[in-house]
A protein has these predicted regions:
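Glycine-rich segments within core transmembrane alpha-helices of 12-TM secondary carriers
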Residues: 49-55, 136-158
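Helix-loop junctions on the cytosolic side of multi-pass membrane transporters
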Residues: 171, 181-203
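Short helix-loop-helix connector
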Residues: 31-35, 66, 123-131
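Transmembrane alpha-helix termini and helix-breaking/packing motifs in multi-pass membrane transporters
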Residues: 27-33, 60, 64, 87-93, ...
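Helix-loop boundary and gating motifs at the non-cytosolic
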Residues: 1-62, 69-79, 84-87, 143
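Cytoplasmic helix-loop-helix junction between adjacent transmembrane helices
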Residues: 108-141
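Juxtamembrane intracellular "pre-TM" segments in multi-pass secondary transporters
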Residues: 1-5, 193-213
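Hydrophobic core of transmembrane alpha-helices in multi-pass small-molecule transporters
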Residues: 13, 82-83, 89, 95-115
Length: 213
């Protein structure tokens, strides 16, 4: 397998495993730690299901940008920095840590969803026609294996910490694990080539004449 398709697999394994392992039940545990009400906890934990609406805006923004590689690196780099801060927020007093956690989580999820269309276009334009037919199925298979391992590790850390009355330590450990995964993913991200964009066709002379006032 060529270097670029392989790097896209590694980037997906590292970043998506870190992202999906820290949604749902793990975030619910963190909201319980901060003493959120049930209504607020449901809103926060449900963001991964409600914020995909931002993909519409993200696709339009990516289509209009003149610097696609910069757009991709900025969006993908930002949410990968913000996500571990969600768990490191427990280092602050709860009155300050709770709002910081919510802000970082909303921004991380929102920016990830905003960048999804551009990320898909980047992958397809970079590896299309250069990989075997089973590339995408192999990519998903390895992702599921990695995600399962990361999710189990995170769940065990949180459960063990809760049983020993050391929830803060547990969330810090999850933050360290997230930082390691996402830092590794950033090194891979910076190696990925610029997306290939087809040149926009100029309108035919006859068509251009029709458009003139």
């Amino acid at each position: 397998m060529e270097k670029t398709p392989r790097d896209f697999i590694f980037d997906n394994l590292l970043s998506m495993s870190a992202y999906w392992a820290c949604t749902g039940a793990i975030i619910a545990s963190l909201t319980a730690y901060y003493g959120f009400s049930l209504a607020l906890s449901n809103v926060v934990t449900g963001l991964s299901g409600t914020l995909p609406i931002l993909q519409l805006a993200g696709g339009l923004a990516y289509e209009r940008t003149t610097r696609p590689l910069r757009f991709l690196r900025l969006c993908n780099g930002t949410w990968r920095v913000l996500l571990p801060l969600v768990f490191f927020s427990v280092l602050l007093p709860r009155t300050a840590g709770a709002p910081l956690m919510v802000v970082c989580y909303v921004l991380a999820i929102g920016i990830y969803q905003f960048a999804c269309p551009s990320q898909t276009d980047w992958l397809v334009s970079s590896v299309g026609g250069r990989v075997r037919g089973d590339y995408y199925s192999v990519r998903e298979m390895f992702f599921m294996l990695t995600y399962t391992g990361v999710f189990c590790a995170v769940s065990l850390i949180i459960d063990r910490a809760a049983r020993h009355g050391a929830q803060q330590t547990g969330f810090l450990a999850v933050g360290v694990l997230e930082t390691m995964l996402l830092a590794a993913s950033l090194t891979v991200l910076l190696r990925l080539p610029a997306p290939e964009r087809p040149e926009k066709e100029e309108p035919a002379p006859a068509a251009a004449a029709l458009l003139e006032p």
